[in-house]
């Protein structure tokens, strides 16, 4: 069945309203444009993100419902805390963003991944500009897990995560939630629910309350130096 999909104007960074996104496929909003920083920032500030495969035009999405974490409410299980104490893992922030993005791409087959070379370069540029950030989990100096995403005010828009060792992505999320909440962060956007996110405790909310929170928080200012490269440490009960 044919569908109508707006094409973005290459001369500006305007997007259709998110509520006009298709129901099937869920959230598909527009195509075209580019992955330049101005367009990416305009997209994320409206709850829109790119997601496409090699050989496809750039596709822009704003699905409903939306998967989120509330960082101040993330509670690790007793078993996860016990595992971490014995793991020898070290968790860092913004120490290896390019490697994290590359690992997220490599953990999927070329047919499955949406993290194309153009996407890798675009988010590396966003990192260089101070918008894209990564969390890394290290074991014996080897990168074994982590995730990356964009900060928009007090909202963190998660893009992808990977795990090469037991509980690595769970521990990365736990430490980041604690750090981000302490710095004034209020919301983590996970885009689309999946089994892994659900197992970590992600919630789903309708488009309207998600957009309301995003509009309220996208201009918020969190503490300075929140994303300088650092080792993340929290007291373990």
Swiss-Prot record:
The keyword Cytoplasm applies. GO terms for biological process: protein catabolic process. Pfam families: Leu_Phe_trans. InterPro entries: Acyl_CoA_acyltransferase (IPR016181), Leu/Phe-tRNA_Trfase (IPR004616), Leu/Phe-tRNA_Trfase_C (IPR042203), Leu/Phe-tRNA_Trfase_N (IPR042221). Its main location: cytoplasm. The keyword Transferase applies. GO terms for molecular function: leucyl-tRNA--protein transferase activity. Keywords: Acyltransferase, Cytoplasm, Transferase. GO terms for cellular component: cytoplasm. It catalyses: N-terminal L-lysyl-[protein] + L-leucyl-tRNA(Leu) = N-terminal L-leucyl-L-lysyl-[protein] + tRNA(Leu) + H(+); N-terminal L-arginyl-[protein] + L-leucyl-tRNA(Leu) = N-terminal L-leucyl-L-arginyl-[protein] + tRNA(Leu) + H(+); L-phenylalanyl-tRNA(Phe) + an N-terminal L-alpha-aminoacyl-[protein] = an N-terminal L-phenylalanyl-L-alpha-aminoacyl-[protein] + tRNA(Phe). This is Leucyl/phenylalanyl-tRNA--protein transferase. It comes from Photobacterium profundum (strain SS9). The lineage of its organism: Bacteria, Pseudomonadati, Pseudomonadota, Gammaproteobacteria, Vibrionales.
